[in-house]
Amino acid sequence: YPKYNEKVLNTSYASMIENSGNISDYFLNITNHYALNLAHKFNTMVTLSFENDFNELKNIMNNYPTSNTGLLVYGKIELMMMKACLLKNTFKAKNCHICKDKKTYKLIDRNKEEYEILTSPQNHTSYILNCHTTNLIDKIPTYQELGITNFRVDLSSETAEDTVNIIEQKKKKINI
């Protein structure tokens, strides 16, 4: 497949400065227009924090109007990243390759909530995702009125059919 975008998601202020001209991730926690201004000095597109409510987004965009801001509108928020293989440690496996089996693993809490675990066999990193999926696709027109122009979808364990439906919903909301 051709590469449509070779930009890197900057997940920290250090990587943002080092990899200038890329896209900031929501991990930078852009929650006010001062942070947005700083992030725009180093990034071509800045993703606003998912923790902002509508009034906070409105305030940010009123104080720093720009056409190159983004917002996560669908996906499970990454809650934790560990530089260790959670599966290997859990199953006490030596020379473990459990994560290569493509099974879905979940962490279940005392309330029976299921947190998806993603693994990266290349660097033995584990990611724990929120048990609830954020779905703000219906609010895209409202966010567009504020001046937000980029809408991100993070897919993790969705089926092919779910993926097509999510993308179709998004396309309808942004009038593609």
Question: Residue ranges of each PLM-predicted region?
Answer:
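Active-site pocket-lining/capping segments in soluble small-molecule metabolic enzymes
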Residues: 1-176
